[in-house]
Amino acid sequence: MKLSPSFEDFERGWAQGRNQLVHARLAADLDTPVSLMLKLAEARSDTFILESVTGGEVRGRYSVVGMKPDLIWRCHGTGSEINREARFDAQAFKPLDGHPLDTLRALIAESRIDMPADLPPIAAGLFGYLGYDMIRLVETLPDVNPDPIGLPDAVLMRPSVVAVLDGVKGEVTVVAPAWAASGLSARAAYAQAAERVMDALRDLDRAPPALRDLGEIAPVGEAKSNFSHDGYKAAVEKAKDYIRAGDIFQVVPSQRWAQRFELPPFALYRSLRRTNPSPFMFFFNFGGYQVIGASPEILVRLRDGEVTIRPIAGTRKRGATPEEDRALEADLLADKKELAEHLMLLDLGRNDVGRVAKLGTVRPTEKFIIERYSHVMHIVSNVVGEIAEGEDALSALLAGLPAGTVSGAPKVRAMEIIDELEPEKRGVYGGGVGYFAANGEMDFCIALRTAVLKDETLYIQAGGGVVYDSDPEAEYQETVNKSRALRRAAEDAGLFARRGNG
């Protein structure tokens, strides 16, 4: 098994104080992302998996499993803390001095690595979520709603082992970073990273702990919302009052359901990837809770110096036949309300990209196209711009957080109204899930179609855009419809619950 780089090349970089990656490749055409997770990490605490399926049917090239973080950063309100002993002591968090966004920016800088050309950016970095409420660190907003789930506002982990499955080549690359600030000699640092790689490669040779039969459907508890039916419709009417008064053009209220869920968390992810394949699929096990999702939408991406925001607004269900599907597409593209709502969010996307892009570089590369997913089709546009001098991955992410599709326009006033209309703090929902790559790039999706599991309770949240002529009953039903993919996954999770969930 060949390790890259050679020790001689590694030693030269180490002498210059450079962080480096040690990696090795293995043929893996029999492995799936799920089998990788089960063999390497058993879906235990402080592990994650990221996958992608575009158009509901085309699997993305790379899937990633991360584990054994050497540090975990998290934020609560106006304070942040870090655990640099995360491999050995899950409780060893120490408070950090300074503004949380400053401590995060410093950690991103500390975690920079010049990536080898043959590794994708996702092979190393900081992985996790920045919740909706992180915007309170940037904008002055009321912060008075109760927080019954009680999660950190943001958590990012830095895995010491990452496995990248290349679905095109049928191979897996196991990557371990070596950090120059560790104080180790070049020989010791190389040996430590190499041992982590080889341990993971040995784990790949074992059979995943799973049965092939599909088990049985298991009952889940009744879902209870933090709104009554009439209460949600009243919130929609109140939102329309603000629109008529000229405060806003659009706002996106949401409701959250809670239900008992006593099956293994990874069974829910396995069920979700089967029932609702999506461009951004993720499972994060943070120990005391899990974040599991199948999001359709980029929040912000920074790649090759280009910032991308991809607004999605306007929805129809998929047709039962190709003819019905085309008819529904034509109906969607003829719906003036849907088109007006999408245009507002396209303009908002232009503004968000423009906050961190060079003058004159912001442009839409796609406008009002239809993208099809497993259950629905959407109107989609794509906005890009070259990142300006002095801006970085974090400032680009904050320019788009939260997305207009989960807040409204104008964004700050819409968020104030959301705080008034909704009974509880949003938490993860409406924020971003993804990673800051070690090479300085970044890719986050919006935390939509996203569930939180904590204390055997499953939380699902969904919202809808309200405009001046919205029908309150239709808006209520839209939130119910958007929650269906996760409800269905929860109902079917028993099919995966016998074994093979860590």
Could you tell me what each predicted segment is?
Residues M1-G502:
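Extended alpha-helical targeting/anchoring segments
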